[in-house]
Amino acid sequence: MTKKDIGELKRRFKKDECTFTRMCGAYVDNHKNILVRLNETFLNLETEEFYKYLEIAKKVLSGTVGNNLLNLEFPLAEEEAGGRQQFLMGLKSSDFKNEELLDRFYEMVIGNYDYVGNYLILLFHDAYDVMTKTTDNSKLDESEEVYEYILCAICPVALSKPGLGYLKDENRIGPRIRDWVVCPPDNGFIFPAFSDRSADIHSLIYYARDAKEPHAEFMGAGLGCDPKRTATEQKVAFHSIIKNAIGDDEEDSAEIMMNIQESISHLVEDHEDEVFEETAPVVVTKDALPSLMTEINIPETVIRKIEESYEEEFGDTPPAAEYLIDTKALAANAEKKKALVLEKEVETLKQQLEETKTAEISEDTIETYDVVLRVRPQKVTQIKSEIIDGQKCLIIPLDEDESANVNGELL
């Protein structure tokens, strides 16, 4: 599943291109009771309803692949008789005409979706005639296959905000009646997955609006798929590993974390020419960690601790390098570095101006004195005049890393 696949499906969710055949659903209260069922021919909906439901369907294909959109695979056991994959295949083939199958689906969601409050389960059925494309992406007037799929959206239903309004029957301003409003979906899925412009019956596309809490319990217990962590979850886990290994020093932890992220960012940049949208991104394995941290001066004991925790956390499924990077933090750090470089450049220019100013001594001035000194501004306060053995002397202390030049001769 790629952004290109998602985009191809999503572009069809328009009034003149939409081919949804049916839409059905169930409204569930906070006691997990079904209050209302609906089953409609989608194209017969009133215009306003049509667009509202279409907008909900679009949301299930929104977000970032790998973070809000996950490709979940079915274990072999779920593809056997009685498995969830087989059940979804039957539901898709029924065209939503089998009420018993629909009720079983609603109960499957209600029993395995951990949510407190009212929500609406929506199901859309579609058959997309996938047209053949040439190498330059031009469409040919012939069908490659018919991609038949179901789209599910789970939408919270919340009370509208309290407020004042015009009460027509009483002809006055008063507290308005609060309605139960269907919100954009929190979760959803498309089955089967659409991959390389074809149906993949061994997996589905899972949608999570909140990548921090994607409802992993529904992925596994509800849909029967092997749960996956979102990019956000993987990044949070990785950052926790680093912080726990380094200790309580927040300043050191933040600096080391930033340096590690810069190393990972360079790794991604180095593979830019090799990593394409259609292929798997570069991953960070446990064996790759030492090379990412050797130039950051992290103690060997800390590196080993990070490696152990990393393997325990991610095992045989290492995360993609791009998932571990906080792009906003990296951008802010880059700006900070630029500001520091600029400050140093300004300081150097100031120093050069001071030196030039000191050097601009006229010949008359030089002839007036027997000794003319040119020193850096910070050395002026260290110069003393003392009488030594009856002779007036100038004392200029020199540090170990300092040198002096007298009329072109280095002392």
Model-derived features: where do they sit?
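Phospho-regulated, Ser/Thr/Pro-rich intrinsically disordered or coiled-coil terminal scaffolds
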Residues: M1-K4
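Short helix-onset patch at the extreme N-terminus, typifying the N->h transition
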Residues: I6-K10
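Leu/Val/Ala/Ile-rich N-terminal alpha-helices, chiefly Sec-type signal peptides and the beginnings
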Residues: F13-V28
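Long, hydrophobic alpha/beta structural blocks
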Residues: C24, V28-E360
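Long, contiguous regulatory modules within eukaryotic nuclear regulatory proteins
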Residues: T348-I388
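Extended, charge-rich low-complexity regions and/or helical-solenoid scaffolds
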Residues: R374-L411
